[in-house]
Amino acid sequence: MVEKCYSCLICGYKGLIQNPLYKGEYQKTFDICPCCGFEFGYSEDHDVRLGFIVTPDHLIEAAFQLYRKQWLESGMVIAHPEDIPEELKNGNCLKFEVLLKQLKKLNLDIENFEISGF
């Protein structure tokens, strides 16, 4: 049986066991993306500095954007490289062309990203 995987809302990697969206609404699954390391239900409250102990629902997308920005600026280091296929990696980081494909799947305007070093 092939397990269905869902896309990460941060980096677009299709490797989540549980869908972080239910009927279009965000849900805290506590699933961890093997690519960017975001834990849905934890990281938005603890890994992103928004000035809140718990991120209000109306700021979830802002938390996603900030975490994504932090991950990109830190070099796109893969959180769990053992779970990512070799062809997607450049050492311990995600290949740039793979990143672009993943972000496009999220319908993000990649022209708005400033990613240096590539």
Curated annotation (Swiss-Prot):
Highest taxon listed in the record's lineage: Bacteria
Record-given protein name: Uncharacterized protein YoaQ
Gene that this sequence comes from: yoaQ
